[in-house]
Amino acid sequence: MNVYTEHGFASRAEYLLTLSDEYDLPLAVVELVASQLGDTEDFDGLLVELSSIRELRSYSI
């Protein structure tokens, strides 16, 4: 069992796809941020970054 299955996901890919849906962000954005942070940040720093990106996208000029 790995950290993703412990949290109810079949794989990291499934987890990132779920985050893409939850944060209403393109999967490519989620994958890019995840690759930059590394998998050790998947359940901490990644969530903070995705939340920040979602908030920034809510502003319009």
PLM feature segments, named:
Residues M1-L32:
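N-terminal acidic leader/helix
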Residues D21-I61:
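Short, charge-rich amphipathic interface segments used for partner binding and complex assembly
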